[in-house]
Regions:
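Glycine/serine-rich anion-binding loops at beta->alpha junctions
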Residues: 128-137, 174-176, 255, 259, ...
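A juxtamembrane structural motif centered on a specific transmembrane helix
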Residues: 2-4, 334-393
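Long extracytoplasmic/lumenal interhelical loops at the membrane interface
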Residues: 251-288, 308
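Hydrophobic alpha-helical transmembrane segments of multi-pass inner membrane proteins, especially
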Residues: 10-240, 279-340, 364, 368, ...
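Generic N-terminal amphipathic/basic segments
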Residues: 1-2, 13
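Transmembrane helix boundary and interhelical junction motifs in multipass membrane proteins
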Residues: 177-182, 257-262, 272-274, 291, ...
Length: 395
C-alpha cells in the first residue's frame, strides 16, 4: 500500500507521507517493545486498521496526514490512560457520575454552539481545530453506562441508565445526527440485555425506536428521501443515489487486489474517505483488504465474547461487548449503507475513515475490549456476580 502511494506521488511526494508512516512504524514498535510483544493481539489489529486509515488519508487528502497521525497518537494515549483506569473497578465506579455528566454537558453544549455539516449539527469549531463531540461521548457512554449496571440490575440503576441513555441520544436527534444516535441506541440495547437477559425490555425499547424512526421519516424530508432511495439507488443514480452507485462501481473496478493507491476515482465523490470509505479501500487496495478491515472488527467481537465469559467483573464483560458491538454495528451501517443494502446514514468506519475525532475516540474505545483480556479473567470476584447473557457461553 505504501509502495503504491510512493509510485503515485513519484514526482511530487508530500513530505507528510514518509514522515507520518515512519512515525507510525516507530510508534508501533515502541508500544509493542514496552509490552514485550505480550498480549498485544487487539493492538496489532488496531494498528492494521490505522495503517489502512493513513493510506486513505494519504490518497484522498494528503494535507490531512499530519492531523490524522496526531489523532492516532492522541487515540493511543487515551487508550493507555483508560486502560490504566479500568484496572481499578472501584475507581471506575467513583468516576461514572463525573464522566456521565461531562458527556451530557458536551452534547448539550454542541446543541448551542455546534456547526452544521452534512445536515447534522455535530461539530464544534475551536478555531485551530474542529472536533466532533459525539465521537468522544461514545467512550463516556460505555464507561458510565456499564458502571451504572455493573453491580445490580436494580430498578433504580435501570432508571438511571435509561435516563443517561436518553440524555445522550436525545441531543443527537436534535442535532439530526441519526446515524450516531442509532449506534448509541445499539450500545444501550447491548448493555441492558447483557445485564438483564430480558427480551421484553429490549422489545419495548426497540418498539419505541421504530416509532421514533417513523416520526422522523414522516416529518424530515431529507431523511425520507434517503429511505426512498434505499434499494433503488440505480434509479436515482444522478441524484440521491449518486454516492451509493459510485461506491458500487468503485468496488467492482477495484476487484480483489485494487488499482493501486491514488489511482482510484471515488475520491471525486463527496465523503469518499469517510462515509464511503469501504468502497474507497476496495477500489484502491482491493476487496480483500476491505474485507480484512471488516474481519478485524469481527475478531474484536469474538475476543470480547470469549474473554467476557471468564471476566472477574461484570463491568469488563459488559463494556467489552458493548464496545465491540458498537464497532460492528457502525461498520455495518457504513458498509451496507454505501452499497445500498441499508439506507445511507453517514457514519464512519472505525479506525479507517479519515477524521481526527473518529480516529482518536475509536482507538480509545479499544481499551474496553483490551481490559477484558486475560489479566482480568478468572473466577468472578466476590459480590460481582455474573452476566446473565454470558453465563451459558463457553468458547
Amino acid at each position: 500500500g505504501c509502495l503504491s502511494l510512493l509510485l503515485h506521488y513519484a514526482d511530487k511526494l508530500p513530505l507528510a507521507l514518509p514522515v507520518c508512516f515512519a512515525g507510525l512504524l516507530l510508534m508501533e514498535w515502541i508500544y509493542c517493545g514496552v509490552r514485550r510483544f505480550q498480549g498485544v493481539g487487539v493492538e496489532l489489529l488496531a494498528f492494521f486498521l490505522v495503517t489502512i486509515g493513513l493510506f486513505v488519508a494519504a490518497s484522498a487528502v494528503p494535507s490531512s496526514l499530519y492531523k490524522q497521525f496526531a489523532a492516532v497518537l492522541l487515540g493511543l494515549a487515551m487508550f493507555c490512560v483508560l486502560s490504566l483506569i479500568l484496572r481499578d473497578v472501584e475507581l471506575t465506579m467513583k468516576l461514572r457520575y463525573v464522566i456521565g455528566a461531562l458527556a451530557v454537558g458536551l452534547l448539550v453544549l454542541n446543541l448551542f454552539i455546534g456547526e452544521t455539516r452534512g445536515g447534522g449539527k455535530n461539530w464544534i469549531n475551536l478555531g485551530f481545530i474542529t472536533i466532533q463531540p459525539s465521537e468522544f461521548v461514545k467512550v463516556a457512554f460505555i464507561f458510565a453506562g456499564c458502571a451504572t449496571l455493573e453491580r445490580l440490575m436494580t430498578y433504580r440503576n435501570t432508571i438511571l441508565f435509561v435516563l443517561f441513555s436518553g440524555a445522550c441520544i436525545g441531543p443527537l436527534f436534535l442535532m439530526k445526527d441519526f446515524g450516531t444516535a442509532a449506534i448509541f441506541f445499539m450500545g444501550m440495547l447491548i448493555i441492558a440485555y447483557m445485564r438483564s437477559g430480558d427480551w421484553k425490555t429490549i422489545a419495548f425499547f426497540s418498539g419505541l425506536a421504530v416509532a421514533g424512526a417513523a416520526v422522523i421519516i414522516a416529518f424530515m424530508p431529507y431523511v425520507a428521501s434517503r429511505f426512498a432511495t434505499y434499494r433503488h439507488a440505480w434509479e436515482y443514480a444522478a441524484s440521491s443515489g449518486y454516492q451509493q452507485t459510485r461506491t458500487m462501481v468503485a468496488i467492482g473496478s477495484g476487484g480483489l487486489f485494487g488499482v493501486g493507491g491514488g489511482n482510484g476515482n471515488l475520491d471525486m465523490v463527496a465523503a469518499a474517505d469517510t462515509d464511503l470509505v469501504f468502497g474507497f479501500v476496495s477500489e484502491e487496495w482491493g476487496l480483500l483488504i476491505a474485507l480484512c478491515c471488516a474481519g478485524c472488527l469481527i475478531l474484536f467481537a469474538l475476543y470480547a465474547v470469549r474473554c467476557a465469559s471468564r471476566a472477574r467483573s461484570a463491568y469488563f464483560a459488559i463494556a467489552a461487548c458493548a464496545a465491540a458491538g458498537m464497532f460492528l454495528f457502525q461498520a455495518a451501517l457504513n458498509i451496507f449503507g454505501s452499497t445500498d443494502l441499508l439506507p445511507l446514514t453517514g457514519v464512519t468506519f472505525p479506525l479507517v475513515s479519515n477524521g481526527g475525532s473518529s480516529m482518536a475516540a475509536n482507538f480509545a474505545m479499544l481499551a474496553f475490549i483490551r481490559a477484558v483480556g486475560l489479566e482480568n479473567t478468572g473466577p468472578p470476584a466476590a459480590g460481582k456476580g455474573q452476566v446473565p447473557l454470558l453465563s451459558l457461553i463457553h468458547i
